[in-house]
Structure formats: C-alpha cells, structure tokens
Swiss-Prot record:
The keyword Repeat does not apply. It comes from Prochlorococcus marinus (strain MIT 9313). The lineage of its organism: Bacteria, Bacillati, Cyanobacteriota, Cyanophyceae, Synechococcales. This is NAD(P)H-quinone oxidoreductase subunit O. It is found in: Cellular thylakoid membrane. GO terms for cellular component: plasma membrane-derived thylakoid membrane.
C-alpha cells in the first residue's frame, strides 16, 4: 500500500462543517502569509471558523464575523477545541 501525504491525512480529519482555526506556525511560515497583511487578525488563530468546503488540499472557512470567506491550505488548519 502506498504512503499518503500529510495534507491527505489532514483532509480526512477535517470535513465540511468542522469548526477550525488557523495554526499560527504553519500559516506564518507559508507563502500565503508572505503575500498577505503582515499582521493577520487574531480571530483566525483563536477560531472558531466553519469549514464550508474542502477541495484539492484547500478549505473554505467562514468566520463568525462580518468578513469574507477565505480559502486556506488544509495543512494550515486545525480542529477547534
């Protein structure tokens, strides 16, 4: 049996409707963070956000605030607890 990649394992753990937050370390060391606002809002790290869709290693997250939904890599998301 072939080994699976880490994003595929994360996708299995995070499904549509899950409550998530952004992993600060994974996000801050990413290309997306380098191309974004230098100080991202705290609410993305505190959560919860609802995972609306999962597609090809990315998840669409809706925050409980009047802000646009965002697509983030699944490996940057973690379950909210």
């Amino acid at each position: 049996m072939a080994e699976t990649s880490a994003p595929a394992k994360a996708t299995a753990a995070l499904k549509k409707g899950a409550l998530v937050r952004v992993n600060r370390h994974a996000f801050s060391s990413s290309t997306e963070a380098a191309a974004s606002d230098p100080s991202p809002p705290d609410y993305i790290f505190e959560g919860p956000g609802e995972l609306l869709a999962v597609k090809e290693g990315y998840g669409q997250v809706r925050w409980r605030m009047p802000v646009p939904d965002v697509w983030l890599r699944i490996d940057q998301l973690e379950p909210f607890s």
